Design a protein with these regions (language model features):
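Targeting-peptide/extracellular-domain and disordered-appendage signature
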Residues: 2-9, 17-170
Length: 170
């Protein structure tokens, strides 16, 4: 009888632990369903709010130096989220056109995140250098954008303002 009770209690404990494990895994699964079921195009405007340049060797800007930025995003005139990016200066194509390898994380309030990365070429501008228009390949997403693919066209309007046109496909 003692052996039977031990077996029943052990079985109940194992079943309880297995049930909790399954429920934990199920609750960790994202609730957001992908929104990208057909091709989508939309534009957000960005305004730079934070900027920091890190010069790793204390000399002129060159390979290995990097910058980090934060941008406020607006869509149809309303706040839409933020963009964080980091660019590392690479070897120049020409002395007047520095290049950088850049990572971008667009966080859209209540929707998810879209990530992208690319090489960016800069051209002389009145304020120093400004990126020439370029396209970013989308590398991933979360939440509503978890299945996003495509590209983002980037056009700088001035030093602190840019437009990002997303061309997303499922």
């Amino acid at each position: 009888m003692h052996r039977f009770r031990t077996l029943v209690v052990t079985t109940a404990v194992i079943l309880s632990l297995a049930t909790m494990a399954v429920m934990s895994i199920a609750s960790a699964t994202p609730n957001n369903q992908p929104d990208i079921t057909t091709a989508q195009t939309f534009t957000v405007l960005a305004h730079a709010t934070n900027f920091k340049m890190i010069n790793v060797d204390g000399e002129d800007i060159g390979p290995g130096d990097y910058l980090v930025e934060r941008w406020a995003l607006r869509r149809s005139g309303s706040p839409a989220g933020r963009l964080n990016d980091q660019c590392t200066i690479n070897f120049n194509q020409t002395p007047s056109n520095p290049t950088a390898l850049c990572l971008f994380a667009f966080t859209f309030s209540g929707k998810g995140e879209i990530t992208a990365e690319s090489s960016v070429v800069f051209a002389p501008a009145p304020e120093g250098f400004r990126p020439v228009p370029f396209d970013l390949p989308v590398t991933g997403g979360t939440g509503s954008y978890q299945n996003a693919r495509g590209q983002i066209h980037v056009q700088f309007r001035d030093l602190a303002d840019a437009s990002f046109t997303f061309h997303l496909i499922p």
